[in-house]
Amino acid sequence: MHAAALGADAAMVSAVGQDARGDAALKQLRAVGVVCSAVARLPDHPTGVVRVSVDAKGLPSYDIAAGSAWDFIPSTSAVEHMAQRADAICFGTLAQRSPISRATIRRAVAGTREPAWRLFDVNLRQNYYDDAVVIDSLELANAVKLNEEELAAIARLCRLESATVVEQLRELSQRFGLKLAALTRGAGGSLLVSNQGVCEAPAPPTKIVDTVGAGDAFTAALLVGILVGQSLDEVNRSANAVAAYVCSQPGATPPLSSSVRLSVAKG
């Protein structure tokens, strides 16, 4: 949704149930311009539900319903066509918790055409992933976005030997042939490592209301910024600006202000 709000021709690959929640989800997606032709309607599985609770420090935890429609995303001609036309595709671990959706996602990512960006947004949620999914996803990707906890987990999994965060991201990129590694650090801003160099950006001063959705907003702005030709510094600044704005608003997908949208368009 954030990518569409930032002016991209955005599409979603997923599945919802033949239920009121599915109707509402599709209506909301289409209202902001997201193409939903690859979102399946499944009569035998309910639309996914996530219950979010926030602790005293403002950190969210998630109760993610099992057996949801998005655990059964079918591989269709619409998915294949969308992947072949994409300039960028974003995927994570959570939607790969079931074998059916995992196979569909892997096929879609593998079906993109060069020089499409294949960004692995790590999103390690509770016990909804295993080591094989993480490694397979890194091998499919040509870019990765992760937070500090996720980098620590991947450093252990991949036995990264580097001592510093920058060197860990470089080592990870070299091992898996990644063009870009993006590390988000909450109030500490973000760090981008690519063959263009290393770029750090601070997070703008923000009164935090709700951090849910900030990571997805960062990812959307990152990819849109790259696709419109921003420099690494511009991409980093604008992605931080979008994420900070989302943190200042209630809800995971608040309408973006015109100034925030302009920051991605101009860098």
Language model features: what each stretch is:
Residues 1-9, 54, 225-229:
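Alpha-helix C-terminal capping segments
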Residues 10-47:
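A glycine-rich beta-to-alpha transition motif near the start of alpha/beta enzyme domains, typified by
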